[in-house]
Amino acid sequence: MPNEATPAEVVEIIGRTGMTGEATTVKVRVLAGRDQGRIIARNVLGPVRVGDILMLMETAREAKKLSIR
């Protein structure tokens, strides 16, 4: 079942990132799967707020800080 997404809840909004501020860095808590309960940082495009549920295709990768120019 490698094509299934894993739900994750947004617990904190860290800030805007990217060259023009187009992405938002958030901390999410993985709700299911082998990484259940783990909190990771992810970059999100589009509107997002605390409490939203994101469907992640991959839970092993963490977001790095994108440069702002």
From Swiss-Prot:
Provide one Gene Ontology cellular component.
cytosolic small ribosomal subunit
Q: Does the keyword Glycoprotein apply?
A: no
Keywords of the record, alphabetical order, are: Ribonucleoprotein, Ribosomal protein
InterPro entries recorded for this chain? Answer: NA-bd_OB-fold (IPR012340), Ribosomal_eS28 (IPR000289), Ribosomal_eS28_CS (IPR028626)
* GO biological process entries: maturation of SSU-rRNA; ribosomal small subunit assembly; translation
Query: Coiled coil located at which positions?
Result: none
Q: Which domain of life is it from?
A: Archaea
Recall the GO molecular function terms of this protein's record: structural constituent of ribosome
Q: Write out the similarity annotation.
A: Belongs to the eukaryotic ribosomal protein eS28 family.
Name this protein carries in UniProt: Small ribosomal subunit protein eS28
Q: Which organism is it from?
A: Thermoplasma acidophilum (strain ATCC 25905 / DSM 1728 / JCM 9062 / NBRC 15155 / AMRC-C165)
